[in-house]
């Protein structure tokens, strides 16, 4: 059944790509792809405690509907409603928190508005939700990493689109989950079939989120051209999710989105920087870094940042952040 479902998704994507000029047809097919993604990526909870955690994550914090929760958990609508009642879980406003809220992204709701054909089967183990200070259930989804490139080719991709070197070899990566810590920190580690290890650590602070990526070369050869894509998706951030790049800018390592009302900002940065860019179709922000060349047995690291700002002097805020990051 799974193979058949994947085949249907691939047919839909092929139709979308072939119908570039037929905007309405493409939008319809892309919406079907998003629904198929959620069904395939349903992850049943391993225990009652895990079920409660994920229901709280989805409904209390993300504000998921019963339908979205069912898609993410694999439960029926009736089972979702029964468990929400048993655990007394309901949506709660996330405005006015003392510090930023960071949670694993739960799947069930595609993190993009558009260009869905370029992100089939989004994997939840690379994605975190960082909640803005301004909305009841407003958040950005950070894909860390979305993709890792090297001299070997596309070495890792956090969804299905362009085949990776391991896809071409017929090798499948197992599903993982974020490790959750009492202070809100999330971390994860993945081992690739050729021995490369990489991982991410994401730490919530009062007014920003610190991020780190690391990679260890477990191969016998030098790894070069280690470019990384880290994507900040804006679909669920009210005031930032218009499909345009007119509200986006970059300065040094900073990629920045401005709200529709003009005085709220989402700021992200990674160093050392490879390039900053944006995609209006998703919509999303990128501050994409590059690891230094990595010898066999060596570990290399990257540092990242995400914060929110309300005010009219974005230049001064970037200077403040730069000082804070250097301390």
Predicted regions located by residue number:
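Beta-strand-rich recognition/accessory modules
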Residues: 161-173, 177-180, 260-327
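A contiguous, surface-exposed recognition patch within enzymatic or periplasmic domains that forms
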Residues: 124-126, 132-138, 144-147, 218, ...
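Short, amphipathic alpha-helical "recognition" segments used to contact nucleic acids or chromatin
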Residues: 48-63
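Acidic (Asp/Glu-rich), glycine- and aromatic
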Residues: 204-244
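Short Lys/Arg-enriched helix C-cap and helix-to-coil transition segments
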Residues: 91-106
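Bacterial N-terminal signal peptides
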Residues: 7-22
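Acidic-aromatic substrate-binding/catalytic surfaces of carbohydrate-active enzymes
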Residues: 102-173
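Extended, loop-rich substrate-binding clefts of extracytoplasmic carbohydrate-active enzymes
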Residues: 154-205
């Amino acid at each position: 059944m799974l193979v058949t479902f994947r085949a249907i998704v691939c047919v839909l994507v092929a139709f979308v790509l072939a119908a570039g000029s037929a905007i309405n047809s493409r939008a319809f097919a892309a919406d079907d792809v998003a629904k198929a993604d959620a069904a395939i990526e349903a992850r049943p909870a391993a225990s009652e405690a895990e079920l409660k955690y994920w229901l709280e994550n989805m409904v209390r914090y993300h504000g998921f509907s019963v339908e979205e929760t069912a898609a993410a958990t694999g439960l029926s609508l009736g089972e979702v409603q029964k468990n929400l009642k048993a655990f007394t879980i309901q949506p709660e406003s996330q405005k006015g928190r003392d510090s930023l809220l960071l949670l694993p992204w739960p799947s069930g709701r595609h993190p993009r508005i558009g260009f869905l054909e370029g992100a089939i089967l989004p994997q939840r183990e690379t994605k975190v939700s960082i909640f803005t200070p301004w909305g009841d259930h407003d958040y950005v989804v950070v894909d860390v990493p979305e993709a890792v490139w090297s001299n070997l080719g596309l070495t890792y991709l956090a969804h299905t689109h362009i085949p990776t070197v391991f896809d071409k070899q017929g090798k499948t990566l197992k599903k993982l989950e974020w490790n959750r810590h009492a202070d809100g920190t999330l971390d994860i580690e993945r081992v690739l079939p050729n021995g490369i290890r990489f991982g991410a650590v994401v730490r919530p602070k009062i007014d920003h989120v610190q991020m780190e990526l690391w990679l260890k070369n477990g191969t016998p050869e030098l790894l070069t051209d280690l470019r990384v894509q880290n994507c900040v998706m804006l679909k669920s951030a009210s005031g930032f999710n218009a499909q345009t790049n007119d509200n986006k800018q970059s300065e040094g390592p900073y990629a920045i989105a401005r709200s529709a009302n003009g005085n709220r900002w989402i700021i992200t940065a990674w160093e050392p920087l490879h390039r900053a860019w944006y995609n209006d179709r998703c919509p999303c922000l990128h501050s994409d870094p590059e690891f230094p060349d990595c010898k066999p047995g060596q570990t290399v690291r990257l540092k990242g940042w995400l914060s929110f700002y309300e005010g009219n002097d974005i230049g001064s805020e970037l200077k403040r952040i730069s000082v804070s990051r250097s301390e």
